[in-house]
């Protein structure tokens, strides 16, 4: 009998997770069923409990339900606890729900794939929301020197204080960032691109920087990456690799095997019409 999985979100029709997980399952001839489920913004918890009651083995969670899924779980990982959000739930043998947040592991795995995860490098993260919260622990454990900058500065300050015991992290306002020396890696973790926007930065910050946008789009044409190309940046990447890698860690949690991501990523790029 095929094991039952799903991704829950609202909206959800755009999700590539069912396709990704079926490709993972094919690597080891596993039988799974993986659906995209539209969560009700009021009755989400009831829906999720019923899904597990009906025999589901695990779920992925996307916006806007990650914090609510975390609160629903019985036990959770440290990364999940720090983020206050879950993107993966697993039904344990005793019926309890275990929550994890694989965003950070997936992000760092993609940086490692790109050979961009270099100890002691200076990293600027734009944004101080849930996505940033989910990736800070593995970044700091990988010895990255992190600077947070956010439109609402106090949110970046509070986040830096929360994670200070795990590594080198500071908050710098967007108005002060103009005085900062160049960064080795600049990460866009804002949601501005969904409305076609981005945070413009002084050109000198890009002088030797690689740029990673956690959003993804056909041909890597997110608003932020379109902008940084005009600033002369030649090393850039969108978040599709992060999506595939975080999915791989979810699959490992459920099925006990870490799938290979490179061919899956290539297939996704081809499906999206990526042209080198």
UniProtKB/Swiss-Prot annotation:
One GO molecular-function entry: shikimate 3-dehydrogenase (NADP+) activity
Catalytic activity line of the entry: shikimate + NADP(+) = 3-dehydroshikimate + NADPH + H(+)
Gene Ontology CC: one annotated term: cytosol
Binding site for shikimate: 15-17, 62, 87, 103, 216
GO terms for biological process, alphabetical: amino acid biosynthetic process; aromatic amino acid family biosynthetic process; chorismate biosynthetic process; shikimate metabolic process
Biological or metabolic pathway of the protein: Metabolic intermediate biosynthesis; chorismate biosynthesis; chorismate from D-erythrose 4-phosphate and phosphoenolpyruvate: step 4/7
Record protein name field: Shikimate dehydrogenase (NADP(+))
Subunit structure, interactors included: Homodimer.
Disulfide topology: none
Gene symbol of the encoding locus: aroE
Keywords attached to this entry: Amino-acid biosynthesis, Aromatic amino acid biosynthesis, NADP, Oxidoreductase
Active site: 66 (proton acceptor)
Positions contributing to NADP(+) binding: 78, 127-131, 150-155, 214, 239
Pfam families: SDH_C, Shikimate_DH, Shikimate_dh_N
Family note: Belongs to the shikimate dehydrogenase family.
UniProt EC number: 1.1.1.25
Function, as annotated: Involved in the biosynthesis of the chorismate, which leads to the biosynthesis of aromatic amino acids. Catalyzes the reversible NADPH linked reduction of 3-dehydroshikimate (DHSA) to yield shikimate (SA).
